[in-house]
């Protein structure tokens, strides 16, 4: 029987033979489970096509398929469900409908606009279901069948991908013929196929969840084991380093103590003669403290040797010292008691030094204690001597250099320029030159210079200006403006000029950069180091640079 031409590219007389139903169902499931989106970020969950024609064997499969609640896909359309794998919306499902022309629609609104634009009357937006069914809609009675089919598909992912390509090519090229004498409608066959694919999809998802949980548990166990192993190795390394360093310290301390004891053997006879009852009491207190705090017998023997002074006990302490060295290599408990031993050593030094306050203590005893414990303790006399720094002593202040004075500068006579500046006249008296800069500050020369001569006639020196009344000075400076402020500035400047030790006049009250530059150019031979900002000083400064060779200026 010839199949009708339904818009495909086949020849009109070509016959189409339908595939067996079980093979096509497998291919549909493979497409639903193995497909990944083109961008690699979406997982194709299911892909449903409407079979244009219904197989006669569909009735036999209807009893083994799970029923779903969504409508079948319209004729020629394809329904694709994708799950997002990444991003903030990972796990969300997207439903697409692909038209026979290849157009993709993601929402019911865009689909309705498309149908309205093309004038479609047979199809309605309600025929397309964009919802994803919940998990509970699948009948659990058929799980064993879908699980068996799924396990047969899982081992070979390459076979699945090949089957996907085959099914897609078949969908694009093949059109199934309409069977004659079928009792079921196309809707029931589409429902059965979609139900079986969805059932297998649910089982595949459950298996993937179980596998992911197992992998997470195994990773956690591995990380915990790695962390514990690394912590153990770190602790072992730290312990070994501490043991090695403390062994070396113990060796050095034992050797030094034995050497000091050997040097002090000849002095023991003198100590036995000079020891007094008070020293005996001190020995008893030292021995009690050693018995209470010292964990090892070697230290007790050492303190008995210090207090007794007999040669037999010295040999016993030497043997105890050797035993102590052997114990440091074998026992780790003595390493922990290192800090306690140091505290005991300081305690014994304090007791022996405090023995000097007793009435009948000898100088030999003091010498002995200072030699044996000079490494562990610092004498108090050395700390008490240097209470103040040498910098603050009077001797240091006398020897220190005083700040440079104005007399250290070499005076010179600045050459006369064609600009006729007032500084060229007053260079011989720095005070008058600086007073002129105060007058010329923010004031033109035509106004300031006549008032300046009047002021210098009335107040010819800094001593006179220092003792003047600021009201009289302000009356004189009224034509210049800011007369009160300038009068007070002149009086204070004159006082600091006489009393303050200054190097440059910018350190004085009321003198700025203009006055400082004028002083360095005209009073001191530092015109080469100055960069003036005043326009008159700039002219004079440039003139000096242009003519310094003719004027033989250094």
Swiss-Prot record:
CDD domains: MeCP2_MBD (cd01396). Residues 1-23, 154-195, 209-252 are annotated as: Disordered. Residues 154-164 have a biased composition (Polar residues). Residues 178-195 have a biased composition (Low complexity). Gene3D superfamilies: Hypothetical protein, domain 2, Methyl-cpg-binding Protein 2, Chain A. GO terms for biological process: DNA damage response; DNA repair; intrinsic apoptotic signaling pathway in response to DNA damage; mitotic G2 DNA damage checkpoint signaling; response to radiation. One of its GO terms (cellular component) is nucleus. Residues 63-135 form the MBD domain. InterPro entries: DNA-bd_dom_sf (IPR016177), DNA_glycosylase (IPR011257), MBD4 (IPR017352), MeCP2/MBD4 (IPR045138), Methyl_CpG_DNA-bd (IPR001739). It is an enzyme of class 3 (hydrolase). GO terms for molecular function: DNA binding; pyrimidine-specific mismatch base pair DNA N-glycosylase activity. It is found in: Nucleus. Pfam families: MBD (PF01429). The modification Phosphoserine is found at residues 296, 402. Interacts with MLH1. This is Methyl-CpG-binding domain protein 4. It comes from Mus musculus (Mouse). The lineage of its organism: Eukaryota, Metazoa, Chordata, Craniata, Vertebrata.
């Amino acid at each position: 029987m010839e199949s009708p031409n339904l818009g495909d590219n086949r020849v009109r007389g070509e016959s189409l033979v339908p595939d067996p139903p079980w093979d096509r169902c497998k291919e549909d499931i493979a497409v639903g489970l193995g497909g990944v989106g083109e961008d690699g970020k979406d997982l194709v969950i299911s892909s449903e096509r409407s079979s244009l024609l219904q197989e006669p064997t569909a009735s036999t499969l209807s009893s083994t398929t799970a029923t779903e609640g969504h409508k079948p896909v319209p004729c020629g359309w394809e329904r694709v469900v994708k799950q997002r794998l990444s991003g903030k919306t990972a796990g969300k499902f997207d439903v697409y409908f692909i038209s026979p022309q290849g157009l993709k629609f993601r929402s019911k609104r865009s689909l309705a606009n498309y149908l309205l634009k093309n004038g479609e009357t047979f199809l309605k937006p309600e025929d397309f279901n964009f919802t994803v069914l919940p998990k509970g809609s699948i009948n659990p009675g058929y799980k064993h069948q879908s699980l068996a089919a799924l396990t047969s598909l899982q081992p070979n992912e390459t076979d699945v991908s090949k089957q996907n390509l085959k099914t897609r090519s078949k969908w694009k090229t093949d059109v199934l013929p309409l069977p004659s004498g079928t009792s079921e409608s196309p809707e029931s066959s589409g429902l059965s196929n979609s139900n079986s694919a969805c059932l297998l999809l649910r089982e595949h998802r459950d298996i993937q969840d179980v596998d992911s949980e197992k992998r997470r548990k195994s990773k956690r166990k591995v990380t915990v084991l790695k962390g514990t192993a690394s912590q153990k190795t770190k602790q072992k390394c730290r312990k070994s380093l501490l043991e090695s360093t403390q062994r070396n310290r113990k060796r050095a301390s034992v050797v030094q103590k034995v050497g000091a004891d050997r040097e002090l053997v000849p002095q023991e006879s003198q100590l036995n003669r000079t020891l007094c009852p008070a020293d005996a009491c001190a020995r008893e207190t030292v021995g009690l403290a050693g018995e209470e705090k010292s964990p090892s017998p070697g230290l007790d023997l050492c303190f008995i040797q210090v207090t007794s002074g007999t040669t037999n006990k010295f040999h016993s302490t030497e043997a105890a010292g050797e035993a102590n060295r052997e114990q440091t290599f074998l026992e780790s408990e003595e390493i922990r008691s290192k800090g306690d031993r140091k505290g005991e050593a300081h305690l014994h030094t304090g007791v022996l030094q405090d023995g000097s306050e007793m009435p009948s203590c000898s100088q030999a005893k003091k010498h002995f204690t200072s030699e044996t414990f000079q490494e562990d303790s610092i004498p108090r006399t050395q700390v008490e001597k240097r209470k103040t720094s040498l910098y603050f002593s009077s001797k240091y202040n006398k020897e220190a250099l005083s700040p440079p004075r104005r007399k250290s500068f070499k005076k010179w006579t600045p050459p006369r320029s064609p600009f006729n500046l007032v500084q060229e006249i007053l260079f011989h008296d720095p005070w008058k030159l600086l007073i002129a800069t105060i007058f010329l500050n923010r004031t033109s020369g035509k106004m300031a210079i006549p008032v300046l001569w009047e002021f210098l006639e009335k107040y010819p020196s800094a001593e006179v200006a220092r003792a003047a009344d600021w009201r009289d000075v302000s009356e004189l400076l009224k034509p210049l403006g800011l007369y009160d402020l300038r009068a007070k500035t002149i009086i204070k400047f004159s006082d600091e000029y006489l009393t303050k030790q200054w190097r440059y006049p910018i350190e004085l009250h009321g003198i700025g950069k203009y006055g400082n530059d004028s002083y360095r150019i005209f009073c001191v031979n530092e015109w080469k180091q100055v960069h003036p900002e005043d326009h008159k000083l700039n002219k004079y400064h440039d003139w000096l640079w242009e003519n310094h060779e003719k004027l033989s200026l250094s």
